[in-house]
Amino acid sequence: MCLISFAYRVHPDFPLIVAANRDEFLNRETAPADYWDDYPEILAGRDLQAGGTWMGMTTAGRFAALTNYRDPSSELKGVPSRGELVTQFLRDTSTSELFPESAEIDIDAYNGFNLLTFDGAHMGYMSNTNRSIRRLLAPGIYGLSNHLLDTPWPKVQLAKSSLEKQVSAATPDTENMLGFLRDDRIAVDELLPSTGVPLEIERALSASFIRFPGYGTRSSTVIIYGMDGSVTFTERTFDVSGASVATRKFVVDLKDQISL
């Protein structure tokens, strides 16, 4: 993922609402969201090159999502894919507080990342860019891109404010959330972060919905957990031109699985 906004225990009827975009190289093979053949409890898209995923949930209510931390100067080659961290959490049974030690994962073996985890009771956030950045989250509206949680990049602020409007409604509207994820406006130069990439790329990456030669937003996903135990998972995929290709919707029944 490259942009995630989420409301955690803010809406009285929907304890977790997630709206996110996945940005990736356009030639990287990807499978759309579905239940996995090898792990049928996992519902997620899949990176067919490395085998992991950027975001997903399970039929038991676990959720995880990941963004890369953008710092070209520290990127190492030949290290494990960060997408396997999401898969590991979804397959694990430990709490957000105990992961990843419970799975015997060395977080320093990966390039920089941010990881969000929800175990059904608590929402966790961690980043391997600084070992002190690891905590359970309080209720609130959050935004995450390719820096730390709630870093006030323009598109992060925009996504949070757009999500806040949905949270104030009686029922969040999936189409409206997919709509604000489609915002392709570029931030003005004075508001751009400096992440070590050329200015032309920094500009392109400042949009919520990215279109750049060879790279761009591949999918938008909205996940809504209801207090009634029902979760809706909606994914919209895009072609290389940015046009919508398909929208897939799943409803997961968590009754008797977790207590939200």
Where are these regions (language model features)?
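N-terminal nucleophile
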Residues: 1-260
